[in-house]
Amino acid sequence: MPKLKNHSGAKKRFAKTATGKYKRRKAGRKHLLTPQSGSRKREMRQTGIIKPESAEGKLLKKYLPMD
């Protein structure tokens, strides 16, 4: 059986919390921010949370087996 390894791209983008959820950064914060409203930019400042039972969470379990 081959060694289990974390997906290097997922490792850089997602972090597992103590409760088993995954943290991620919100998209759209790099450029072209002027036409966006302040409330939208403020919302993107917060971290996104991915629940482990969601479809994305199940994929992340496969991508990050060592976490």
Curated annotation (Swiss-Prot):
GO molecular function: structural constituent of ribosome
Region (Disordered): 1-54
Keyword NADP tagged: no
UniProt cross-references to InterPro entries, sorted A to Z: Ribosomal_bL35, Ribosomal_bL35-like, Ribosomal_bL35_CS, Ribosomal_bL35_sf
Keywords: Ribonucleoprotein, Ribosomal protein
Pfam families: Ribosomal_L35p
HAMAP family, sorted: Ribosomal_bL35
Name under which the protein is recorded: Large ribosomal subunit protein bL35
Gene3D superfamilies associated with the record: 4.10.410.60
Entry's family note: Belongs to the bacterial ribosomal protein bL35 family.
Extent of Basic residues compositional bias: 1-32
PANTHER family linked to this entry: 54S RIBOSOMAL PROTEIN BL35M (PTHR33343), LARGE RIBOSOMAL SUBUNIT PROTEIN BL35M (PTHR33343:SF1)
Biological processes per GO annotation: translation
Any one annotated GO CC term: large ribosomal subunit
